[in-house]
Structure formats: C-alpha cells, structure tokens
Amino acid sequence: MANNKLAIIGGSGLYDVEDFKNRELLDLDTPWGKPSDQILKTNYNSKEVYFLPRHGKGHFISPSNINFRANIDALKQLGVTDIVSVSAVGSLKEDLPPGKFVIIDQFIDRTFTRNKTFFDDEIVAHVSMAHPTSSGLMDACEEAIRKAEINYQKGGTYVVMEGPQFSTLAESNLYRSWSADVIGMTNMPEAKLAREAEIRYASCLLYT
C-alpha cells in the first residue's frame, strides 16, 4: 500500500488544485496521442499525487472528443495505481438535490462514438466490469467527504450519455425506470480503460 500513487481526474469546473504545492507540469506522449492536458505532479501529505483536467484547462474538449485512452495510458506510464475521478452530473431522483456528492459504484454506458478499449488491434482481451469501482478507494473517498462534513450518498448508478446535448424527457424517464441515480457524459469509457490498465478507480460526483 505504501507504493500506491494517486491521480485525480478533474471534470467540469475543476481544472487545477491550487492547494497543491511543489508543482511540476509533465508533458507526456502515448501511443494513443496526447492526453487532455499537461499532468500536474505534486506532493500532498508527503505522498506523490497527480492531477489531470479531463476537458483541458479552460474546458476546451467536449466529452466525445476526450482522448480517454491517452489519459489513462499517461497515468499508467507514471506508475499511478489509483484514480479518483471527479465530475459534475445531473440528478435523476428528486431526493438527490444540487450540492450533494455521490460515490458511484455502477455505470450504464450509453456512449457510442468513443474508443473504449486498449485491445482492439493485435491483442484481444476481455476484462470483467461487474464491479467497475474499487471498494477500498470508495471507502477512502467516503472518509474524506465525511471529515469535510459534506452531504453525500455512497453507492448509485451513473448513466453515461454521449452528449454534448442533454437527454430528452423520454430518455430521462427511461433511465429512471432503470433505477439510475445520476446522468452525465464523462466516466465512460474512462472507468473501462482504467480497469483494462489495472488501475483502481473511484468516482466522486457532484449534483449540479
């Protein structure tokens, strides 16, 4: 556990973490192209931490155009073992008000234009997605959120739509009938690729 390396992938509205000191910006290349932006390397509580803005600083990359494979591959190159993904989402339930956090444990992937695997050329592999998030990493996120006295929910299902348009009313009602909790555009195929790269993954979402 002492050799764990954490990366935070920031979503809409989270493009930097100013509290991180001793900052170094890393410009990486991958076989899949460039990641969304430079990766911030820093130390927090004497631990090495990395930060990557999913949409690029200034939010110039739309969800469908994010190079998810390059993002995950770049973090793998850095030896990252754990990813905490932070995203803004919409609520599908009346009892989940704006400002509440949820630590998601399941996904429904409704995207259809994105490259979703590292294994589509020369090598074929099939990984289990039954449990796409790490229970241990979820527990760590819960502890941090609880210490900050933030309203949260642990567990839930995230519908990931293609975007950039929002869902129709009929689509939202369909997702509610599936018992989904939230809807957004960014955690797929990110979670699948992290799984293929053998990086533990947890998703902390903010209802907006």
What are the roles of these predicted feature ranges?
Residues E122-T133, E162, L169:
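Polyanion-binding loop/helix "lid" in catalytic or ligand-binding cores
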Residues Y207-T208:
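Conserved small/polar residues in nucleotide/adenosyl-binding loops
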Residues I150-D181:
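Active-site/ligand-binding-proximal alpha/beta "capping" segment
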Residues A2-M129:
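Metabolite-binding pocket within alpha/beta catalytic cores that recognizes anionic/polar moieties
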